[in-house]
Each structure stands twice: as structure tokens, then as C-alpha cells.
Amino acid sequence: MMETNSIQKELLLTSYLFEYPSKEWWGDVKECAAAAHTVARPQSREVLEEFFDYVEESDPKEYEDAYVRAFDFSQNTNLYLTTHNRTDFGKQSEELLAYKQLFLDAGYDLDHELPDYLPAILELAAAVPEKRAAHILAAVRPKLELLRDRLIEAKLPYAFLLDVVLTGAAHLEGRTAS
């Protein structure tokens, strides 16, 4: 894992935890769990440590099944942010273009993923300077809040990860609001 500031680290770790738990993903769990212990902000560190404990204590197949039920089989809690509350596909297309522009403005392009995929957005915010990260997270904040509310409603532990993201976003917005 690259050297980052604490909020960047939080964003990378939450991005990782929102990724599909493939065989390669499981191979990185211990390294990422160790990185969670070095997160500077105590509340974020505690949430990440507890989530990694949950992951490490889970049976991989059961964890994968729960992940798929939470994100792949649920329209309400999937990780593609423009699909929530969307019946106007023209508006969804406009949102996708706006998300794509966030990546292009930062010098990145996505070849194999849609630009509204939450882990990709979190990785992008972790890879750019704080001011741009604050802008990216502010642009997606309403969608993050909606997803968080739906995860809470569904009683899914991933809601705690969005708490980490949203408090990190608020912190970045406060630091860059000059």
C-alpha cells in the first residue's frame, strides 16, 4: 500500500472493503488490516479495525455470499451510485458523464469500470490532492448519504464504512474551504 495521508488511507481502505471479495482480494486482507491500525483519526481507525476483524473472522464463502446479496442482487444498495432512485435514464446518462468528467479532470480514465462505481470513486479521491478530493466527494455526497441510509435500513455493516468516508469528506471540505 502506498504512503498516504490519513484520509487518503481511509478512502483506500474503504474502497478496498467495498470491492468484490475475490481470491486476490482475500490475499490482501492482512496487509490492509495492518494498514487500518495506522489510520490517524481514532474513530475511523476503530471502524476500519472492527470491519477488518469482521472480515477476518468470516468464512470466505459466506462473506462472498453476503456481499453478493448486499450489492449485486439489490437495486437499493448496489455500488453504482447513479442507479439509486433512477427512473429517468436520460438524467442517469448525464450523471454518468459528470462522474466520468471527475476522472478526466483528475487525469484518469476508466477502461473497465463505470465512473459511478463507488470503489473507483473512492480510489480516485485517495489519489488526488486534498482540494480535488474534497470536490469529488462533495459532488457525490448526496449519493453516498442515500446509499448509507439504505445500508442502515438493510442492517448492513457497510454503512459504517460510509460513515468513515462522509466524515473524511467533511474534514477535507473544512480544510480546503479557504
Q: Predicted regions: what is each one?
A:
Residues 1-110, 114-116, 123-178:
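Charged, alpha-helix-forming regions
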